[in-house]
Amino acid sequence: MTHFDFHVHTALSACADNLLSPGRIVRKARETGVDFVAVTDHNASAHAAVAVRLAADCGLHILPGMEVNSREEVHLLALFSELEALEDFQALIDSVLPVGENPTGFFGPQVIYDERDEIVAMDERMRQMGVSLGLDVLVEEIRGRGGYAVPAHVYRSRNSLTSQLGFVPEAAGYAALDFAARTWRSEGLAAGQRVHGYPATTGSDSHFLEDVGRHFCTISRSVGTVHELFGALAEVAP
């Protein structure tokens, strides 16, 4: 059996708790028994490498990731197996972000921590807004780097496929669809179940430490890599 959460924010996301360091997330995830955690900050990834280093010796698998905001204002989880692929994707995102500094008084600070839970910097780029690349292009860029593109909180009333496009595109290259916890429970969904032709997943969308490990997805098979994990999701019967 494998427990995973593809959607966890750190203090690098302006909308998250400023105390949400990678170290605190790693420790909380281990306490709650989650096996895979994806660090997915808004258009940012500075904490992914820190989390990977901290988790290396404790049996927790960290997926380097990001929640990128497309030109259409659709939130898309970009998940990778290697830090280098995420770093290359980050360079692309930095080149297509809106120009300007983060309005801290409006969005909140974007805090960068080290391995000792100490604040070392503030990210001053404006990262909450949509980038200039469309959803289809972003999916291609993620897949071209060996990553997995997963539209986030698909049925949510904002920043989702259904809120921004009005539908879920078929055969669009998505590795899975992410559903918010409330939708997951109300619809009675299960990991890998086909919805709109894609495997269903769910995650905590944690913005506070107490949310880490509160809601996650489970498959019956034990897997050791992100490729095996997505393979297992894809093999679930429709």
Locate predicted features:
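Charged catalytic cores and adjacent phosphate/nucleic-acid-binding surfaces used
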Residues: M1-F6, T10-V34, S45-A91, Q110, ...
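Conserved Rossmann-like nucleotide-binding pocket used by diverse enzymes
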Residues: A38
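Short, cationic low-complexity segments
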Residues: D94-P109
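Short, charged beta->alpha transition segments
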Residues: G105-F107, L133-L138
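Short, basic/glycine-rich phosphate-binding loops at helix/coil junctions
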Residues: F107-A121
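Surface-exposed cleft-lining segments at the edges of enzyme active sites
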Residues: E118-G130
